[in-house]
C-alpha cells in the first residue's frame, strides 16, 4: 500500500503531467488562429472550397487526411513567419508541394497544419543570359517548361509535367537528361531555404556549401526550400514520343531493353532515354506495355533506340522537332494527375546487365502467379518499370560536386532501378496489396543476391512506406548518413524537421 507521502507525490506528478498536456493542446489549438490573424490571405480553414481542393483531393487516396487548417504562404518571408508560429505552438505540420508521393504522412497530416507551397509559383531567369532559371518551390514541371520552351531551353527536370519541382529535386530527380547532367539535383546551382530558426538563406557552392550538398537528395530534413535555381541548356530539337504495346510485343520489348541497358548498347548514347513499363491488369488478366522514348536532336531515326522503334505497337506518336514542352505534353500519361485512385510505389536496384533485365521481368510474373489472393482485390493494376542510371549519369553526378546519394558503377553498365507500382480502388485491399509488393521486392532482392547482381539502393522518390527507415543508410554505399545527420544538427539543432514534421523520410527514424 502507498504511504500518504507517496500518494501525494504521485497525485501531484499526475496533475502536473495533465497540465503540461493541456498546455500543449491549448498552444496547438491556437496555431491556426494565430496563422489566420497574421496571414489572413494565406490561411485556409475547413469548410471552404479552397480547403477541399487542397486537402480532400490528394493524388493518391492512400494519403487522404484532414488537417486542422491549411497555410499557403506567398513568399519565403511568410514561410519563415508561419514556421515561427508553428514552432512556438509546438504544432506538428506537413509540407506539400504537389503531393505526388504516395506515402501516407509524407505530404499530408491529420490534426496538424498542412503547409502548401503552391503560391510560390514564380518562374524567371536569374539574368539576361538565361543560363539560370529561378523556380518557385510550388511549381509543377509543366509550368517551368512553358517558360523554357520559348527560348529552346531545358533543365534536368521531371519527365512528367504534373509532378512537383520540389519533391523531385529533393529526392534526387530522374530526367530525360540524366546521362549528361546527373540527377536533377546536380543541376541546382542555388537553393533558397527557410531554416528552422526562421532565417532565409542561400545554399550554393560558396555559401552554406554543406547544406547545398545535403539538399541534393537529402529530402525534407534541413529546412523548407522556397526556390530552386537550375542551370539551363539548349535543346532546340527533340525526337521522341510514347508507344503502347499488346501482349505479343512484351518479349521483344524486354529483349530490346536488355540490349539497351549495357555499356555497349543504346544507353551509351547520352542523348537517348527509354524507360519501358510492363502492365498487368489483375481484374482482366490483360498484359500490355508502355514506354516513353526521347532523343535529343533532330535525328528522325536514332540508332540508339532502333531496337524499340522496330517493335510493332498498338499506338505510337514519334516525331522530331519538339521542344521539351511539346515532348512532355505528348508523353504525359492521361491519368497521371487523377486523384481518385489508391497508389503505391516500391523500389529496389540491381547492377545493370542483360541478365538483370530478364530477372526483374521474370520475378514480376512469378510473384504475381504465386499470389492468387490479389485477384480478390478491386480493380488492381500493377506495373514493372525499368529506370537506368547510366555510367554517364554517375560520372556527371560526381563531376558536378557530388551528392549524398553517391551512386557507383558495379559492372560498368550503370545501375538498374526497378519501380514496382500499383493502383487500385478500395481501401479494404490495402493490407493485401502492400504485402504483395513487399513480397515482390523481397523476392527480387533475394534472387539478385544469389546471382551477384543485388545493388543496395532504393530511389527515394519511388520508395514504399515500408522502405522509409533505411533509405539514407543505403546512400553512398552506407557512408552518407553520419554526415547528413551532422549537417541537420548544425542547421536544425532543435530537430524541428525531425519531430514536428513526422512523416516521410527522417534521419531520426534511420538506424545508426
Swiss-Prot record:
The keyword Protease does not apply. It holds the Pfam family FAD_binding_4. Keywords: FAD, Flavoprotein, Glycoprotein, Oxidoreductase, Signal. Residues 1-22 form the signal peptide. The keyword Glycoprotein applies. Induction: Expression and the subsequent production of PR-toxin take place under static culture conditions (oxygen limited), whereas no expression of the PR-toxin genes occurs under the strongly aerated conditions required for optimal penicillin production. There is a negative control of the transcription of the PR-toxin genes by the penicillin biosynthesis gene product(s), or by a regulatory peptide encoded by a small ORF inside the penicillin gene cluster. PROSITE patterns: FAD_PCMH (PS51387). InterPro entries: FAD-bd_PCMH (IPR016166), FAD-bd_PCMH-like_sf (IPR036318), FAD-bd_PCMH_sub2 (IPR016169), FAD-linked_Oxidoreductase (IPR050416), Oxid_FAD_bind_N (IPR006094). It comes from Penicillium rubens (strain ATCC 28089 / DSM 1075 / NRRL 1951 / Wisconsin 54-1255) (Penicillium chrysogenum). FAD-dependent monooxygenase; part of the gene cluster that mediates the biosynthesis of PR-toxin, a bicyclic sesquiterpene belonging to the eremophilane class and acting as a mycotoxin. The first step of the pathway is catalyzed by the aristolochene synthase which performs the cyclization of trans,trans-farnesyl diphosphate (FPP) to the bicyclic sesquiterpene aristolochene. Following the formation of aristolochene, the non-oxygenated aristolochene is converted to the trioxygenated intermediate eremofortin B, via 7-epi-neopetasone. Residues 63-235 form the FAD-binding PCMH-type domain. Glycans are attached at residues 41, 197, 281, 307, 329, 361, 477. One of its GO terms (molecular function) is oxidoreductase activity. This is FAD-dependent monooxygenase prx3. Its EC number is 1.-.-.-. Belongs to the oxygen-dependent FAD-linked oxidoreductase family. Pathway: Sesquiterpene biosynthesis.
